[in-house]
Structure formats: C-alpha cells, structure tokens
Amino acid sequence: MKKIFIIAAMAVAGISTANAQEFKVGAKAGFLMSNVSVDSSSDIEAGKLITSKLNTAFRPGFHFGAFIEYGFNEKIWVEAGVDYAFQGAKLKSVEGTVINVSDGSLIVSKKANIKNGSLKTQQFNIPLWVKYDISGFRPKVGVNLGFLSKVKENLEIEGAPAVQNTINESLTPDKKFDFGLGFGAEYNLDSGLFFDATFNLGLTDLSNKQKVVLNQSGGVARTVEPQTFKNRVIQIGVGYKF
C-alpha cells in the first residue's frame, strides 16, 4: 500500500510539473520599422479628373509589452499579448495630376518633395499567435487587433506657398480599430530568453471620409474619398519567459 501511495504521489507531482510548464508569462521589447500603404485619391470637378498620391517610406520606432503562452504539447503553442507600439511612416513626396475627362488629355502633372515629413502614431496592439516548435525555433502566424491612440503629422512641402506649406498638428483619429495578419518566428533559449521577428500586414483602412466645399459661393459640398492607408510593421524584439 505504501508503494502505491508513493507511486501516486510521484504521478501527481509529474502532472503538476507538466501543467506548470504548459503556461508561461513573459515580457518583451524591441525595435520596429513601420510604414503605411497608401492608395491614390481622386475626384472629378468641372470636367477634370484630379488625382493625388502620397509617397511614404519606413520610419523607425519601438515597442514593448507582455504576454501569456500556452503549450498544448511540445510542438503546438498559442500566445496572447498586449503591446504598445510607436509606429507611423516617413512622408517623402506628393504627386498630383489633372486630366480632361472629355478627351483624356493631361492638363498638368506635378510632384512636390516633402521636407522633414512624418506620420507618427501610437497604438495598443493585441497579437494572437499560433506557433510550432522545432528545437526552440518557432515559426508563427496569427492576427493583430490594434487600437489607435495618438496621431501626429509633420510636413513641409517644398515649393508651396509659405502660408500653406507647413503642417504640424496632432489629430484625433475617427477610426481607431486596426485589424491585421501577422507572420513571424522566434528562437527560444533554455534560460527563458528569446528573440523574435514579426511582420504585421494591416488590412483596415485607417483614413477618414471628409466633406469639402468645392464651390463656396454656391454652398455646394460633397463627400470626397481621401487617400486610404493601412499599416505595415516589421518588429524585432527580445524578451524573457517565466
């Protein structure tokens, strides 16, 4: 009987240890490069098709957060976390064209460079991952739920009139929810230290529709579709799991 109790106690201890190892919590921080995917905007006014395009580039930022991880077995793991990220994009130039709708002829085409241009955003992210372990190396795929908290725009358009060539303002975003797909990988050391790299492909259009007055004397206003933009974020981080 004594042997049975000893074996049972050892089994319970083994199960408890295994279960304890299935759940892990951790924290991480790191560097990121972010950009926004921008589509052209267009409008028709007085028989003219007016299009504009904003050209952007990646800008550096950083992120930090915490997470919980669960292992169904030695291979399959899932993770849910909370991350705060400083994202955005560099604003490089703006291009515009005016085309005659009746015959398709080009009336004017111009490009203006942007000096010291930046779009700075701060965002809460909830990344959800599914991972597969290969001797500590874990490829992962998932989704990212983002909540935009702050937006600031800085730019100076070269060659524009002095009264309207500079913008430096903080914006209150009307669209705050951002949904995206995540792809990445991490490498785990036995000590609990790990390194990871991820890419977030934003699918949500974060621009806003706005009404502009095209004929002030007649009081005519209509809604114009602005340029759409979606997040593109590369993150590289280091963290520790407990």
Predicted regions and their residues:
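Outer-membrane beta-barrel channels and translocator barrels
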Residues: A20, N73-K75, I134-F137, D190
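Extracellular/periplasm-exposed beta-strand and loop segments of Gram-negative cell-envelope proteins
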Residues: N35-R59, F86-Q122, L148-D178, T204-Q235
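Start-of-domain marker
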Residues: E22-W77
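Short Gly/Pro-enriched loop/turn and capping motifs at secondary-structure junctions
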Residues: P60, G192, N200-T204
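Bacterial Sec-dependent N-terminal signal peptides
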Residues: M1-K28, V238-F242
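Residues on the lipid-exposed face of transmembrane beta-strands in outer-membrane beta-barrel proteins
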Residues: A27-F31, F62-F72, V82-Y84, I126-Y132, ...
